[in-house]
Every structure is written in structure tokens, then in C-alpha cells.
Amino acid sequence: MKKYLLIIIGVTLVLILLWWAGIERTIKLMMRADIRFILLAILMYCISVLIWAVRWNTFLKGANINVSFVKVIEGVFIGIFLNNLTPGARTGGEAVKVIFIKKASSNGSYSKVFATVIADRILDVIPVVVFMMLAFLYALTIHARVLLIILGISAIILVIILLMTTVFSIKEKYALSALLYLARIFRKIFPSKFSMSEDKIKEKLLGEIREFKETFLRLAKRKRRLSSTMLYSFILWGADILKTYFIFLSLGGRITFLQVLLVRMASIAVAMISVIPGGIGITEVVQSALFLAVGVEKALAVSVTMLDRLISFWIPTLLGGILVLKNRKLLVSSS
């Protein structure tokens, strides 16, 4: 019930934003969009998703997990769908991606697949931190104090998350303590699902943690694979920023690539702390406000944001939902 209430609040924020910018003017602007640049924006989004799948597939191959590339792409969209249903940093889809690929593969285990997902997430954070630093330097030149604070704090938080994830991935003691704590909570909530003793749970968790750690370290030691996946990550985020830039060009807007970079990084930072699933409403309001901060007219700012969200949020969420329904038997099957 709370989730639905938050979604209603988010949709209300979108409607208020459209009313503030002028619904008729905003719709007219979007209807006049140059289809050539819109197609380029869609192409950039498709490239970013394809690169994401290639990067994850590289880690899956490195872990010797046999799964078709089509299933990897499906796994990415299923993850997007479920991430867009969860608030904040949107990590709800990662667990389902693990389940999906484990069941879709011929030889994958949960701990091995989870190691590839964590490695993929770590490689996703590094370019964001780099681009945030570039945006921070640009914000310094234009004396945007609010943006400087947002970007600075966000970059620090991301680095801390990155370090904590890495430590928990290689230190058995910390990982076991955290998982045992969660197991005790779940045992109280679902006692029938956790009938085994704590010693048995600990033994099972330790086995999974060791397999995860072994897989994670093996992936980390392969320098050539790491170099290629790092390159994929920068291409992915570069395509994401170009997508928004092309949407601006489609509406005849005048903006620099650095301004788009600044707004995208700052809006990602704010979306991380959104309590509304998928950042609905919050992302639209924040991104539009940030475009205003760099001198974009309000109707244009809102039009760009709406088209951006249509391409990178609503359509992928719909596709992901369709793929969840298509693969529902696989996802709920026991194995």
C-alpha cells in the first residue's frame, strides 16, 4: 500500500511539473522534436544497454558460466524493471538477475552469478565517480555552489559504497556476520522457511561466501578482462549522456555537452536518495530544476526531461515487465 501511495505522489509531482511548465507548450515542443535526433537518442540508449549486457557477459564467461547472450540481455531488462520498482539506489533487481541467470545457465551457481553481478556493479560505479569529478570541476568554473555540494557529497558516498562492497566481497568474516544478521531477521519473520539450525545456516553461508570470494578474486585478477570491461563502462555512460544531448538537439535547444554531463551526474546523485520507486516525479523535478540552473528555459527543460524519461525509464520498464511475464515460470521454478 505504501509503495502505491509513493507512486501516486510521484505521478502527481510529474503532473504538477507539467502544469508549471505549461502543458500545452510542453506537448507542442515534444511533438515538434526532430525525429532524426530522437532516433539517435534511442540508438544511444540501445548501445548503453547492449554494452551493459556485453560487460556482464564478459564477467559470466570469466566465471565459466554458460548462458546465451540473449538470456543475458533479458536479464539486464528484468533487472531494470525490478530496479525501477525500488527506491533510492535501485538494487532490487540484482537478486532477481542472479536467480534468472542461475536458472537460465547450464552450470551456474547462485554464489558464482552473484560474484559477476557485484563485479559488474563495481565497474559501473567507477565511471560515474570519474564523470562526477569532471562535472565537479566544470561546476567550479561556473560557480554553481549547490551543484558543487551535491556532486561532492555524492562522489564521496559512491566511493564509500565502492570500498565497502569490495571489502565485504573479499573478507569472509564481515560478509558472514552481515549475512547471519540478515538470516536471523528473516528467521523471525519466516520461521517455516528457516527450519535448520543456526550452525547449519552458518555452514551453508560459509560455503557460498567462499565460492563467491573465489569467483570474485578470479575475475579481479584477469587484467585484460578488467581493462575491456572498464572501457565498456565508460562507453556505456558516455552513450547515456549523449542520449540526453541528442534529445536537446531534437528540440532545438542550445546546450553544451559539459552542461548535460553536469545535470545528468547531479540528477543521478539526487535519485540515489529518492524514497519513491524508480525516482518517479523526483527525478523529473530535479533534472528539470538542474537544467534551469544552467540557463535552460523551463518548457524546454521539462520537455527534454520527459522525453529522456520516456526513452530511458518508461519504455525499458515496460519491456522488462514483459520479459518478467515471459520468463515467470523459469523465475519461480525450484532448482
Curated annotation (Swiss-Prot):
It is a multi-pass membrane protein. It comes from the Archaea. The chain crosses the membrane at residues 4-24, 34-54, 62-82, 122-142, 148-168, 231-251, 266-286, 304-324. One of its GO terms (cellular component) is plasma membrane. It is found in: Cell membrane. Pfam families: LPG_synthase_TM (PF03706). InterPro entries: L-PG_synthase/AglD. The keyword Membrane applies. The keyword Membrane applies. Keywords: Cell membrane, Membrane, Transmembrane, Transmembrane helix. Belongs to the UPF0104 family. This is UPF0104 membrane protein PH1989. The lineage of its organism: Archaea, Methanobacteriati, Methanobacteriota, Thermococci, Thermococcales.
